[in-house]
Amino acid sequence: MKVDYYEILGVTRECDDKKLKSAFRKLAMQYHPDRNAGDKEAERKFKEIGEAYEVLKDPQKRAAYDRFGHAAFENNNNGGGSPFSGFSAGGFADIFEDFFGEIMGGGHRKRSDGRERGADLSYNMEVTLEEAFSGKTAQINIPSSVVCDACEGSGAKKGSKPQTCGTCHGAGRVRAAQGFFSIERTCPVCHGRGETIKDPCPKCQGTRRVEKNRSLSVNIPAGIEDSTRIRLSGEGDAGIRGGPSGDLYIFLSVKPHEFFQREGADLHCRVPISMVTAALGGEFEVSDLDGIKARVKIPEGTQNGRQFRLKGKGMPMLRRQQVRGDLYIHITIETPQKLTQEQRELLQKFEKLSNHENSPQSHGFFSRMKEFFENISGKNE
């Protein structure tokens, strides 16, 4: 018995698209075959998750599933192969024609040519910020359904071929009288395919496809952002009976960086400096993500939180890679700790020699604070 799609993804029936996508990505990452090499249970879960998301992400398929459950897609199953398969565009026409045809006694219709589009697949990939900066070509292994090479996709044993169904005569549907109505339904013998296989292919067991790990080369462009989606047309599951292959979607996530934080095409970096450097001024060297160094001059009296902008030292823009964002340096002044007696005495001497011009903000603040409390005391007397 099939598990409820909502239970598979761990969401409620009322969840929105954002929560649905988030749940799918989390589970797909957890059970991805690359992270669970040789684990058949993880591979089964991965495909089960993909099947559930393939239905629930599409408003029409989701509505049909909410109304009919798994029965909404049973007519399109091919009896085997990848659980991702069987969600072709023509499937929902069959569902509603079956539903209304059985009530209203709809007329006979011609069977389609039987071609079914392969299912779309997804792959989660994590890249470093450096890789997002420069771009890369990655090799991935993706489990998918491919056309059986033993029977060339016919599903029949070598030397034989599928036969026209003797029950529906190739139409894929049969009609029966029920009272005053003529009811048309899917052929119970060929399950709507219009043909039967007497001698199934021993390799694919008549399913026309087999499971295979494929190695693909994926181009990651410079400037990609977290949650970028790359579509590889035709790299999903193989179609059935000459139908087109599905697509492969690469979902990218960018790892957090040790030094840089990203906001769009801009980079931000916090740099700690000593209290002395902040007071007397100085300079330091910083490298951007392409390894080019730049010197940052710190003027005398630099305050904590001051920001310096290095123009054109940020990330390349995805669709205008010749244009780069900026790098922002955020200054953090580090207060000295574990002072020696001599250092303590020098600081105390410095404090005695200081006046309000050395610390205008703190002097002004405490003067105003003193005046504030004096006013309160005067009112209470």
Curated annotation (Swiss-Prot):
Cell compartment(s), UniProt: Cytoplasm
Q: Which NCBIfam families match?
A: DnaJ_bact, PRK10767.1
Q: Where is the J domain?
A: 4-69
**What GO CC annotations are associated with the protein?**
cytoplasm
Chief localization: cytoplasm
One GO BP on record is: protein refolding
Q: Does the keyword Metal-binding apply?
A: yes
The entry's keywords: Chaperone, Cytoplasm, DNA replication, Metal-binding, Repeat, Stress response, Zinc, Zinc-finger
UniProt similarity note:
Belongs to the DnaJ family.
Q: Which InterPro entries match?
A: DnaJ (IPR012724), DnaJ_C (IPR002939), DnaJ_domain (IPR001623), DnaJ_domain_CS (IPR018253), HSP40/DnaJ_pept-bd (IPR008971), HSP_DnaJ_Cys-rich_dom (IPR001305), HSP_DnaJ_Cys-rich_dom_sf (IPR036410), J_dom_sf (IPR036869)
Q: Its quaternary structure?
A: Homodimer.
| Source superkingdom | Bacteria
**CR-type ZnF:** 135-213
What is said about the domains? The J domain is necessary and sufficient to stimulate DnaK ATPase activity. Zinc center 1 plays an important role in the autonomous, DnaK-independent chaperone activity of DnaJ. Zinc center 2 is essential for interaction with DnaK and for DnaJ activity.
The answer to whether keyword Metal-binding applies is yes
What protein name is recorded for this chain?
Chaperone protein DnaJ
